[in-house]
Amino acid sequence: MTEFESTRDVASQLIVAAILIGVFALLAADRVHRVLVPLGAVALVWLISYFTPWRLISFEGARLAVDLNVILLLFAMMALVGVLKTTNVFPWAVDRLLVRSRGNPSRALSFVIWFTGVLSALLDNVTTVIFTYPMAASMAQRLRINGSAFLLPMVMAANIGGTATLIGDPPNVLIGADPRSGLTFLSFIENLAVACTFMLIVLVWYSRRYYPADVGSAANADRPEAIVPSGAELQNVPLLRTTAWIALAILLGFLTHSLTHMPVAVPAVIGVAAILFAQDYYYLKDHKPTAEERQHGVLAILEKDIEWPTLAFFLFLFILVGAAVSTGMIESLAHALSWTVGRISSTAGLSPRATLLVAALLVLWVSGFLSAVIDNIPYTAVTIPLVASLLGHLEAGTDGQVLWWALALGACLGGNGTLVGASANLIVAGIAERAGERIAFMRYLVVAFPLMLLQIAICHAYVLWRFF
């Protein structure tokens, strides 16, 4: 059968919506492995697409829907962390961090949250959690507390910190790259950094309240037994030094994205290829392995440290969201938002400034909720033209830049709401599952969704204070 154009009628959109609702229901029920849920959904989408009149998405459309930039970035960062593990740098760093915190869980959590938030603003939230997970998990283990008390605040801090800069979260990259927004790297920091800093403070408070026995007032005491050195020493220092220099080059590639316009996967893949070659060189030089022993070198990293199930989950999830885009479902939601703004404005006889306020708050809240249930990357890509259209209908002289900030805040922070709301959430869940610390959909939801509502409410107040 030849490839086809997706049908964009209401029936096709309702079918895709029903499938997505089913996916979330199955993930919440937690009865089957999370990878099987989107896999089965994609199979159902193609059965419908190729054997019924409703053409949801073709194979070619699915291929284009998969964000190879995200998949390759994740692969590269997982491989980089795998190489760093062979140098023993993470246990070595944890020893020193616990000494600095005097074994106090509350103080240690504050460090994890602030370190993750700042690093996420400089890199991006996905790369950050891949790097910080080994340290956060090790600190929780050494302190003998619930791993979720460190891991969930860590991933939320990554999503908050990434909101502050143009390169910290993919929605911001899309918004900043669109010439209609007119936004720069500095303008993101100027307009969003204050809000994100306050939300990190709130996250520290919320985490201590939610986990009082682990990191709250009941645990706010030094634990001398936790700062006894584990005896971890750095191994293969030449490889660590080489990896550090190449990692700095990768970071430079990330930071110059607005100038080079290279997808972030490009410097990541180039850098990790060099690192893997270096790892293989030092391994052969130091060990003189037999053919069988060599299986413990690069192949061990590729087999054990790459979260293949998580990458598969992303691949199938991208296809499902691609079906929502190709059938026009997301576009219909965006137009419904535009219609609502116009209806409220005309019915209430609002002034241009009041109309702008209504539009900004609707964009903020709708983006927050939708980004919690669908991938925020295609949502943002489809909503950018809507925001530009809303700006075109504003009266001359009205500064509509607030709509871009509302979109950025809602799309980025909405990802904190559910386990599938942001790529960083799924990465942490995948790595934790392999380590025996399973983070179920509902377990994440009951912790994170109330915080997401609080964050969006804070952004609501911030938009009013900062722009009106």
Where do the protein language model's features map onto the residues?
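Structural signature of hydrophobic alpha-helical transmembrane segments
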Residues: 4-18, 66-79, 122-129, 165, ...
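Hydrophobic mid-bilayer segments of alpha-helices in multi-pass membrane transport proteins
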Residues: 12-24, 31-55, 67-79, 240-250, ...
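Hydrophobic alpha-helical transmembrane segments
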Residues: 13-17, 36-40, 71-72, 106-114, ...
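Transmembrane alpha-helix interface/packing and boundary motifs in multi-pass membrane proteins
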Residues: 25-32, 115-124, 155-167, 364-379, ...
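Juxtamembrane and boundary regions of transmembrane helices in multi-pass small-molecule transporters
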Residues: 28, 145-148, 152, 163-167, ...
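Long, contiguous bundles of hydrophobic transmembrane helices that form the permeation core
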Residues: 199-301
